[in-house]
Amino acid sequence: MVASRVIAVPAGQIATIVTCLEMTAPPAPVVPVKSALKLERWTAPVDLARYRALFRAIGQPWLWRGRLVMDDETLAATLNAPTLEVHVATRRDGTPQGLLELDFSGDRECELAYFGLVPELTGRGHGAWLMGHALKRAWREGIRRVWVHTCDLDHPGALTFYQRHGFRPYERLVEIYADPRASGLYPPETAPAVPLLRAET
């Protein structure tokens, strides 16, 4: 029997349980879900300010920070890499409302690196529409595995959403990192269900 462990998380840091999910074969065809949104690809060079604004609009309630902590040079290199596709769901007037990033840098695999919608569109069927486009593009010729990860800071329905679309959990991790509110990336009142513990100065 493995003894339980308690890990102390320092003030100014945050801990989350990450669940990794995968599928190793394309899901069975389904009737396409309709949406008033349209999908467009942002090709290189991606406008960094516009990208960061969308990333923040989608991810702030869930404390997304991965792209926000990158400097311009690193972010540009990441988004403009030939192995990364940035797709954006927009309203008819072109206003960005959702983000889909497909990372093909792995050997015969695709990672759904980022997937999300602005909060006011969640729970209205647009996520299923966006996932349909994601899987259609991810399962290109030669791909043997598509994977994604989510965490307990994400939308509470994220894990079951991925499972409904054919992903199978295969690994669980604990991640500890600097709280993005402590550094000013987000206001202190963001994600009130996750208390901000400031380091003493």
Which ranges hold each PLM region?
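Conserved beta-strand-loop-alpha-helix junction that forms the acyl-donor binding cleft
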Residues: 122, 148-158, 175-181, 185
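A conserved beta-strand-loop-helix scaffold within acyl/acetyltransferase catalytic domains
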Residues: 66-73, 79-119
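Conserved GNAT acetyl-CoA-binding A-motif
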Residues: 138-150
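Acidic/histidine-enriched, glycine/proline-rich intrinsically disordered or flexible terminal extensions
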Residues: 4-5, 9-16, 176-201
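Acyl-donor-binding surface of acyltransferase catalytic domains
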Residues: 1-44
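Conserved glycine-rich acetyl-CoA-binding loop
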Residues: 118-132, 141, 153-157
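Conserved active-site alpha-helix within GNAT-family acetyltransferase domains
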Residues: 2-7, 153-172, 179
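Short amphipathic alpha-helix that is part of the acyltransferase structural core
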Residues: 33-66, 188, 201
